[in-house]
Amino acid sequence: GDGTRVQILHALEQSEMCVCDLAALLGMTKSAISHQLKALRLANLVTFRREAQIVYYSLADEHVKEIIDMGIEHLYE
């Protein structure tokens, strides 16, 4: 759910990643990660590029990164 999407956004803040990398990092199935990425794409928070058979995801723009940073900062206040 929401917590997973936050984890995905935080991971993508570090670097562009494919579904398999995110699944391994978060200990989830590729199917579950794909489902969450679809929601993030529909919200215009992430973008993707295809390289052969692999799709790489990244944050949509610098504004998304700033929002994530503010949210994480707020959690630790």
Where do the PLM segments sit?
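Divalent metal-coordination and catalytic microenvironments
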Residues: 1, 33, 40
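N-terminal helix-turn-helix DNA-binding core of bacterial DNA-binding proteins
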Residues: 2-31, 51, 55-62
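Conserved segment of winged-helix/HTH DNA-binding domains
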Residues: 56-77
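Compositionally biased, intrinsically disordered low-complexity segments enriched
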Residues: 9, 37-38
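Residues at the C-terminal ends
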Residues: 14, 42-43
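Alpha-helical residues within the helix-turn-helix
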Residues: 24, 35, 41-42
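Short alpha-helical linear motifs
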Residues: 31-36, 75
